Amino acid sequence: AKFPGITAPALGRYVSMTQRLKSVLLAGGGGGARLARGFYGLLNEAETLVLTNPGDDFEHLGLLICPDTDSVLYAVSDAIDAKRGWGRQSESWSVLAEVERLGGPGWLQLGDRDIAMHLLRREGLDAGRSLAQVTADLAKRLGIHSLQVVPASEQPIRTVLTTTEGDLDFQSYFVGRQCQPEVLSINFRGAADATPAPDLIEF
């Protein structure tokens, strides 16, 4: 990893120090995923927890989509599409093409490999496992064995924008409508009742 403006000796001292400390990285969006990837391998993985943003999570086609959490998982496991900065590398699009052919929504670019992740997440949640447990399992399936990747809360937190076209979740506004409707207000539904992830408290 490269850290502009930080000399090698200074970085070495920092890494040496962090090897003896517990570290929590707050990761949201593509920048958070790149941060997690940059520090992966430098910090003591067993003593590092990456806390991901659940505010962009939403339901789509019956699946729970966790964009920020998945971006971290893909980035750390080197499975992310580096050119786009999101999604899986070597992706295919057969399912999306068929959904569109059958008249379903095609605005969200979900590739076949990405959909496989969402299906496994849904299976785990439907079996009664927590979001943190399901995320940990997905991390292991991607080859991440010691670094903890944990959604910030088990309770749903949804970013909802009230616009001139009505209420839209963040992805519908940002991706589906390309930020076109005028935003009147922003609400974080569920935030007031959400509690920190148990794994964070125990960490």
Locate predicted features.
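Electropositive, gly/pro-rich neighborhoods at or near active sites that engage anionic ligands
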Residues: 53-194
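A short, well-structured juxtamembrane/interface segment
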Residues: 195-203
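Short, Lys/Arg-enriched N-terminal segments with co-localized hydrophobic residues
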Residues: 2-17
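Extreme N-terminal starter segment of soluble prokaryotic enzymes
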Residues: 18-23
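Glycine-rich Rossmann-fold phosphate-binding loop(s) that bind the pyrophosphate
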Residues: 28
